[in-house]
Amino acid sequence: MSAPVTRKRLTPKVIQAMKGECPIVSLTAYTTPVARLLDPHCDLLLVGDSLGMVLYGMESTLAVTLDMMIMHGQAVMRGTSHACVIVDMPFGSYQESKEQAFRNAARVMQETGCDGVKLEGGEEMAETVAFLVRRGIPVFGHVGLMPQQVNTVGGFRSLGRGDDEVGKIRRDAQAIAQAGAFAVVIEGTVEPLAREITALIDIPTVGIGASSACDGQVLVSDDMLGLFQDFTPRFVKRFAHLAPQVSQAAEAYAEEVRARRFPGPEHVFGAKPGA
């Protein structure tokens, strides 16, 4: 009998080498059961601070804490063996100084066992990215629309329509690449600019509301699965519609309980003969 084939976990270096090759498949994951389902199909799983909105009902990602990210990072690591797992650095955990960023990123790496961290920001964060990378922490960048800065940009909207925005996003992506990030998310950016940046920089771009020309794509899993119902961004395609199925299952369960059809004989334990 031949031994089972063991797939090694993908590393940030492997992800970086996928630039211009096979598109990078990425989704968010927050829990062990879902991570197990996604792991065989994804190159990179992102433990995103979007969990604040899709799991906890927050209005934005700003209230997500480092402890929350570590707890969910641990859960995702328990459910994966193949995908590269990256954990978001939440708002306030890295912006103060590069030393603060290293201290908190090191804690994330140590306590979760993840493969790297993601942080938002462009030119203003390049020094921090370089500081982390030089100290052994792989960094996944994030430019374009940055949800942690939603209060300063006037809400969730696409960027790159004016010359100032185009120049800023282009410079941001170049700065993050030059600082040593292994890849960069481009979010909510007009298609021609995302396409241009992908050709311009030498690390993979992972698009979300960007361009099919990006080196990979990422979506929030709850959006992709049709579980998150509060709103649907234009860039989301629902590959399933699980929310109605969950509701229907709960309705059927409630009906059977109230009618005393559940549990049935096959779901209960009988007494042993002679007991």
From Swiss-Prot:
Catalytic residues identified in the record: E187 (proton acceptor)
Cofactor note: Binds 1 Mg(2+) ion per subunit.
Cofactor or coenzyme needed: Mg(2+)
Subcellular localization, as worded in the UniProt entry: Cytoplasm
Gene3D superfamilies from the UniProt entry: Phosphoenolpyruvate-binding domains (3.20.20.60)
Keyword flag Magnesium: yes
Residues holding Mg(2+): D49, D88, E120
Primary residence: cytoplasm
Top-level division of the source organism's lineage: Bacteria
Disulphide bonds in the chain: none
BP-aspect Gene Ontology terms: pantothenate biosynthetic process
Entry function: Catalyzes the reversible reaction in which hydroxymethyl group from 5,10-methylenetetrahydrofolate is transferred onto alpha-ketoisovalerate to form ketopantoate.
Subunit composition and interactions: Homodecamer; pentamer of dimers.
PANTHER family documented for this protein: 3-METHYL-2-OXOBUTANOATE HYDROXYMETHYLTRANSFERASE (PTHR20881:SF0)
Name of the protein: 3-methyl-2-oxobutanoate hydroxymethyltransferase
Organismal lineage: Bacteria, Pseudomonadati, Pseudomonadota, Alphaproteobacteria, Hyphomicrobiales
Gene name tied to this protein: panB
